[in-house]
Amino acid sequence: MLLVAGIQFKHIDHYKQYVKLYTQSISRCDLLGIWDCSMYSQAKEYYDFIEKMYPNLKKICAHGLEPFYYMNNSQYCFDKIFKNKKVLIITSHEKTTKLQISNIPHIFKSNKIFHETTEFYVYKPPQQNGGNHDDNPWTHHFEKMKEELKTIKVQTFDFDIALVSCGGFGMLISDYIFSDLKTSAMYIGGSLQLFFGIMGTRWKNSSKIIEHINNYWTYPLDEDKPQNPQLCESNCYW
């Protein structure tokens, strides 16, 4: 959980609190993305638990949150979601994402992910994965994130929706945004960087992603890399 998801447990109560909040986050979703195939089998026992506890929870295939897989569909309209919207981007690739915002019109050759009227604000969460961790438990960073996001919402950028990618904090902070800040949130996860044409090792052999790559794509800047990125699924996001 620490090297990949950035979640540090210092004692048993931290485990219990994390599981409690994670399950609560799922229970309050409007729509839950479920992975298929091998990804499903890895978490089958937990999926079975969710199905038993919340049988009426609406679900979709998690790939539905990744529009680059179905951009060529004649009914594609993902970009309409963001028309005239203020969008908060939560990502550890802060500096790279900010640079890529100006390239958004050129990143994808056919359809787009964001509407031309969309406004952005990029927030970098505490990055604890890839050897970047300190000695604080996950609860310390979670509370700090909540305070900072509330300040952004109230004082700086009254966002309409948050797109979230921040490891093991993602589901919990999405629920905080939705339930406490009363604002829409989509927990995209690691693939959020692809929305901005930021490539990572995980997708270098994916034909579905490679077909979109052009001169406006890039890899994360060195400033956005943790100390030992190879510790996180063999450098998957960098």
Regions found by a protein language model. Name each.
Residues 169-238:
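C-terminal functional extensions of proteins
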Residues 37-40, 92-97, 163-173, 192-193:
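Gly/Ser/Thr-rich loops at beta-strand to alpha-helix junctions
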Residues 1-117:
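Electropositive, gly/pro-rich neighborhoods at or near active sites that engage anionic ligands
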Residues 157-160:
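Short acidic/histidine-rich motifs immediately flanking catalytic phosphotransfer sites
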Residues 81-128, 139, 209-238:
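Non-catalytic interface/targeting segments
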Residues 55-64, 121-149:
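Glycine-rich phosphate-binding "P-loop"
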Residues 16-20, 141-155, 169-171:
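A short, acidic, amphipathic alpha-helical segment used as a generic capping/interface helix at domain edges
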